[in-house]
Amino acid sequence: MMNRIITANLANLASSLMLAQVLGWHEPVYPDQVKWAGLGTGVCASGYRPLTRDEAMSIKGNLVSRMGQWQITGLADRWVIMGPGYNGEIKQGTAGETWCYPNSPVSGEIPTLSDWNIPAGDEVDVQWRLVHDNDYFIKPVSYLAHYLGYAWVGGNHSPYVGEDMDVTRVGDGWLIKGNNDGGCSGYRCGEKSSIKVSNFSYTLEPDSFSHGQVTESGKQLVKTITANATNYTDLPQQVVVTLKYDKATNWSKTDTYSLSEKVTTKNKFQWPLVGETELAIEIAASQSWASQKGGSTTETVSVEARPTVPPHSSLPVRVALYKSNISYPYEFKAEVNYDLTMKGFLRWGGNAWYTHPDNRPTWEHTFRLGPFRGQGEQHPLPVDKRYIPGEVKWWDWNWTISEYGLSTMQNNLGRVLRPIRSAVTGDFYAESQFAGDIEIGQPQTRSAKAAQLRSASAEEVALTSVDLDSEALANEGFGNVSLTIVPVQ
């Protein structure tokens, strides 16, 4: 029994079905588009043209494998390609049949289907909904296995692929397999092919943020700082009064479901702003979403005013310090990634393994599904290069297209590759501190005695009667508070 375990990023199959848009001798030619026509030398059906010599050279192995031992088939410009009995020789000549290629190839792109959104829940709930959905999951992956050549992808009580399937929990994953109860008829019909879904991971989508009703406190007065800006000179003085402080933002979140423990963030991102509460929250990358329960951020902020103080006068200065808080329920979408492992014996009458074995080997193959699977890894087979001889080392996608049709494979792979998302929900709370503007009052003339006492000082301007309790402010989240005054130079 032959066993293989191979991993691949099935998302790359989208590019594997991309067809040439503008054809020329230098453009890739995909063998599944080449058709045989027995209409005479160099004659093709409407909408087709003869394959050129250079195009035939690029896919010679595929063409020769489709020809009889002594077959000779025409190409453009009086060239022919000869069958395996002639070692696939390409030379000048004529033939009564022709290899043809479409003038306007049909686009082979995989359709991008709308996201499948699974309701928020614990991890096992999300997985259960995924693997038990017949239309969105069981049938598409079952048909993929069938198209690749796996035998008996269905249960004993239905003649159709992907029906009468049992889903069981196995370790950290799920096993989908045809029901084997009762009798069945057919070679090795009791050996049902299986599809294992495992190795789940979930990646947060920062741009998918949404929130419910917002509860916001508005600004609440914490403390008012007061002082006097005093001018001891005989001339008016323009001054700069500056309040400088470290502003703290404290935040926390709670998660509704345990799925959040398995969700990770791919890149760091800023928590979206909601309401009027000022926040600057950065969520780290490559960490469990549940582990990021909260934190605090600090930034230094300055507020200033530039009043002119009359001679021998004071201007009252006042700054109000506030705090505010906000809370709301939130939701982010999370991309679901997983491994899809097919195992069973391949049909002798036709399978898509690149060697097309006819001895019914048992084969195991793992596709890695999801937008964040396989990124950065060296892919052993660039399947978008299926037109290059020797590059097909796993599945022969040209064969599947020839066997089942381009549109069938497009539709099936589109359904298998449909993005799957669930939701991460919870409640968010944050508190922020901030200062209002510096308010300047009306000038107050200093008494002659006070001016005389100060006349010996070198200071021309100063802050007097300062009411600022640094320790009390620090307890309220305002650190390193200072209030200064300097004359404008």
Curated annotation (Swiss-Prot):
Residues 1-24 form the signal peptide. It is found in: Secreted; Host cell membrane. Keywords: Cytolysis, Disulfide bond, Hemolysis, Host cell membrane, Host membrane, Membrane, Secreted, Signal, Toxin, Transmembrane, Transmembrane beta strand, Virulence. Disulfide bonds join C44-C100, C184-C189. Its main location: secreted. Residues 257-289 are annotated as: Part of the transmembrane beta-barrel after proteolytic activation of the toxin and insertion into the host membrane. The record marks E391 as: Important for heptamerization. Residues 70-86 are annotated as: Interaction with host N-linked glycan. The keyword Secreted applies. The record marks H157 as: Important for oligomerization. One of its GO terms (biological process) is killing of cells of another organism. The keyword Zinc-finger does not apply. GO terms for molecular function: toxin activity. GO terms for cellular component: extracellular region; host cell plasma membrane; membrane. Residues 445-489 form a propeptide. Proteolytic cleavage and subsequent release of the propeptide trigger a major conformation change, leading to the formation of a heptameric pre-pore that then inserts into the host membrane. Homodimer in solution; homoheptamer in the host membrane. After binding to GPI-anchored proteins in target membranes and proteolytic removal of the C-terminal propeptide, the protein assembles into a heptameric pre-pore complex. A further conformation change leads to insertion into the host membrane. This is Aerolysin. It comes from Aeromonas salmonicida. The gene is ash3.
